[in-house]
């Protein structure tokens, strides 16, 4: 079984709606698809889930989450994405990520970035563009929306 861990940064936008920071995979396979996902990647060596998620987020966005206390990350559980892969996710309130300042490492083939575009999206938009098995992660964060609206 393959394991991946990822981070879902979120914020409350000017319309008072929760938005999630997601990426569009790079490469020929994805260039014509309107698919967006949390930034995630494989667990290496003896890493714990959160360490993997933080490392992968930085590799795929160039944005460091090192300033955040590990207790600030919200465990969102895991899903079986397919018969060979389990995905674990964490949320973090992180409203100051700027899409245009993000860039990704280069994928295994050396030709394309792992992530070629970044966006903040509301759940209503994202639910049509992401992996259906990942929706539970975003739904768990939406349950906390009022708590963050009050602290905006």
List where the protein language model places each region.
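Charged phosphate-binding loop/patch that engages nucleotide di/tri-phosphates or the phosphate backbone
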Residues: 128-152
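N-terminal strand-loop-strand
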Residues: 1-38, 90
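A generic secondary-structure boundary signal that marks alpha-helix termini
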Residues: 16, 62-63, 150
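Intrinsic low-complexity, intrinsically disordered segments enriched in polar/basic residues
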Residues: 1, 109-112, 146-152
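A periodicity- and composition-biased signal for non-globular, repetitive helical segments
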Residues: 30-31, 46, 139, 146
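Alpha-helical structural elements
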Residues: 5, 15, 25, 31, ...
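Unchanged
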Residues: 36, 41-136
């Amino acid at each position: 079984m393959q394991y991946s861990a990822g981070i879902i940064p979120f914020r409350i936008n000017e319309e008072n709606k929760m938005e999630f920071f997601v990426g569009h995979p790079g490469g020929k396979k994805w260039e014509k698809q309107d698919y967006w996902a949390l930034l995630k990647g494989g667990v290496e060596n003896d890493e714990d889930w959160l360490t993997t998620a933080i490392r992968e987020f930085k590799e795929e966005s160039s944005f460091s989450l090192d300033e955040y206390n590990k207790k600030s990350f919200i465990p969102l559980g895991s899903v079986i994405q397919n018969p060979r892969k389990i995905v674990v996710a964490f949320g973090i309130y992180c409203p100051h990520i700027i899409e245009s300042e993000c860039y990704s490492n280069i994928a295994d083939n050396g030709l394309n970035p792992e992530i070629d575009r970044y966006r903040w999206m509301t759940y209503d938009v994202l639910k049509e563009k992401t992996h259906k098995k990942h929706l539970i992660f975003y739904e768990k964060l939406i349950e906390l929306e009022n708590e963050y609206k009050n602290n905006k």
